[in-house]
Structure formats: C-alpha cells, structure tokens
Amino acid sequence: MNIPQLTALCLRYHGVLLDASEEVVHVAVVDAPSHELLDALHFATTKRIEITCWTRQQMEGHASRTQQTLPVAVQEKHQPKAELLTRTLQSALEQRASDIHIEPADNAYRIRLRIDGVLHPLPDVSPDAGVALTARLKVLGNLDIAEHRLPQDGQFTVELAGNAVSFRIATLPCRGGEKVVLRLLQQVGQALDVNTLGMQPLQLADFAHALQQPQGLVLVTGPTGSGKTVTLYSALQKLNTADINICSVEDPVEIPIARLNQTQIHPRAGLTFQGVLRALLRQDPDVIMIGEIRDGETAESAIKAAQTGHLVLSTLHTNSTCETLVRLQQMGVARWMLSSALTLVIAQRLVRKLCPHCRRQQGEPIHIPDNVWPSPLPHWQAPGCVHCYHGFYGRTALFEVLPITPVIRQLISANTDVESLETHARQAGMRTLFENGCLAVEQGLTTFEELIRVLGMPHGE
C-alpha cells in the first residue's frame, strides 16, 4: 500500500500518518488508537506500527496548519473541482502564506505554500485537476485561457471567510504544463504602523525624520518578499492625514488604503509608470509613492519630482543601502541629482522568528570573527511544539537605515565606492543588516543558522 492510500486509511479512522519508512508506519491519534485502525493497518501492511498519542488540541492544530486532505484519487472523488481552488486559497490564508505555487510534475500537479519564507507542500492533485485549477485561475485573473505558450500575469479578488482577499497571478510555460504562482496581496487585519515594523529606536527616529521633510526621495530596498511593501504602506499610513494629498503609481495596487489616490499601471493600454508620473505631477500632490523603480527613466522622474517640492517614496532591488547609491548611478542617474534629492535609504530582510514556547539554548556559543560581531552568539534550537509545530512562527524584519547626511552627499558626488561609503556610514553610527541580525540572535528572536540562510556571512568570512 502506497503513502496516499495509507494517508486515506488513517484519516478514515481519525488518525494522521506521520511517516512511512521501509520498516515502520508512524501514526498519530487522539488519546489511544481504535481497534479498527490497528486492524486496518495490520491488514494493509506488514510493517511495524508505531503510535503517537496526541491531545485533541494537538490534532486540531495539526489539521489547521497542515490542512491534511484526502489523497488525490479520494479527494477528487468526494470533492468537486470548484472546491479545490477555494480550499487551496483558504489554506494559504489560514497558514499565513505569502505565495502559492501550482506546478506540473510527473503524473500530478504539485501545490506548495510559502510560509515564513519557506515552501511547504500540500497534497498533490491529478493532472486533470491541476489543468482545471490553472484554467479557473486564468479566468479569475482575466488572462487568455487559450494561451499556453507565453507567460501572463494579472490580478483578482475573491471572498474568503467573509473578507475580500486579493491575489496577483503569474503563469509560466514549463515542461508538462503551465506553472502558476499566486502572491497574496492583502492580508486580513495586517497592521500598517511604522512603530511596529521592528526598527531599532535610532532607525525609527531617522525614518520618522525623513517622512517629516517637505521634499526628498526615500527608498526601501531588498529582494522580493523582504517586506518592502509593508514598510512603504506603513509610511503612507503615517502620512495619511486630511491636509496631505498622497498619490501612488503601482503595479499592482497591493493594499488599498482609504483617502489615497492609488493608480495601477496598464502597459498594454499605454498606462506606464512614466505616463502616470507625469499625470500625477499635475494633480497637486504632496507625497508620491512609486511602487518600484525599474529603469533609469523612472529613477530620473522620481528624483526630479523629489527636487521640485514633493516627498517621493519608492522601492528598489539591491542588497544593501550603500549598493543602492551605486545601482542608481548604473541606471544613468547623475551623481549630483542623486546627492541633492536622496534623503534616506532603508535595506531590509525577513527572518523566521523562534517559537518562544519551545526555544532553548543548546551546546556551545557560536564564535564568529570579531570584525563581524565582537561576542559569541547563543546557539538556539526549537524542536517544535503544539504552538508552532516546527520551531518557528512568523517572521521579524531586520533593517539597515542610511540617512543621507552632508558627508554622505559629498561622498556620492565624489563617486566613492561602496566599501568606502559603508565604512563612513558605520563610523557615523549605521548598523548593518548582519549586525542587526546578530542582535536578533542575542535577543532570542531567531537563530544564527536562519541569519546565514537569509543573509550569508559578510565579506566572505
């Protein structure tokens, strides 16, 4: 009997298949196993049966977090195709997923959720169900359902648990079919408050000071999925008062906010970043938000807006604050324009948070070079418990904040290299992403291994 069949058998008798190796079948039940379950297992397999007794709370928690379902054949027999999409989206929402991956594999479609930055699998579905699911998503996203050879992207909103939830959809032709990735754009009840982002007090003070300026360019940088959007929208929410006119140009509008004039670009209709920016400048804005600076033309438009009496906020894909300055110059932005307009750069990453209920220090402290961090770091481990199941729950942000001081402006104008810029910034009090990560490890917020997974060791150490 294969694993999907064993999974279905266990579920039939209110158990959960935890593992099935060549010699052992490991099953979890509430309180004690029923005779029916044991008889069925012994009839189905000659392997040794190991039973783990869970409380009802553990079983309910496991079910809600992993969304155990029937295997493909049984699932599709008892569950209409239309319900598969709802269950998948609902699972993503309940488990705090940021992305849903639906991808063709051998003899099945694989579904995975990205939770706290790591992909977790859901049960596979059959090729027919996968194709039907992909087609339904393309209809919702207003994509060409007959086009299978070219990538497409779109957006849709559905109601889940009584709330409107928006997703961004992107398709990609692959061997065996189309791969679909959904990005959850709006999380229900998501707080947008700069005070809860996780910045250190000095960083928060620098951020607040930049937002109080009547003009200038504030950039938030980092890779996809590093929390830039929440930081940007939190800043907009702080500025969102009755006496301020805020306009944004986005692709797409990720979080609708009341009293903001949010415009989504539509390149196929001729509505581009540059076109919207030109129109926004005729709308008497006080604050302009540009979803992302993707090219030199957009960068120059943003800087010119910042030089003409507007506070401009945007994002960029770079690894650190100082690299942002070099990246903008590579886009063709003149050094004098950059030094005169830029007021603050924030680089950020997200790391998984240790579960406070089961974390503990084990083994010897971790020693790293003194030039990276001056003291040993605690070695944290979290085996998992009823609250988290795998040792981590949620994520926390690490920040690197660079105020553009007169000295930094002079260095930018002088075409100073990244290393020298970072040296001067650190001498002025800037703490790097890795240094803030080490501080988070000291505080028990995350592990050193998680820090290395996200950032790697600096300077090749």
Q: What kind of feature is each model-predicted range?
A:
Residues M1-F43, Q152-A161, S166-A170:
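Polyanionic, low-complexity intrinsically disordered segments
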Residues L11, G15-L18, E36, A40, ...:
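Core recognition of P-loop NTPase motor domains used across DNA-transaction enzymes
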Residues R12, H78-S91, Q95-E461:
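Short, flexible helix-loop junctions that flank or precede catalytic/ligand sites
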Residues R12-H14, S21, F43-T46, I51-Q68, ...:
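Short alpha-helical interface patches
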Residues H14-E23, S64-A73, N142, F167, ...:
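Short, charge-rich amphipathic segments
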Residues E23-V25, T69-Q75, L192-D193, N261-T263:
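Short, basic, glycine/proline-bearing loop/turn elements
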Residues H26-A63, G198-H209:
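Short glycine/Trp-rich loop-beta-loop segment that forms part of the substrate-binding cleft
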Residues F43, E50-Q90, Q95, D99:
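Charged, low-hydrophobicity low-complexity segments
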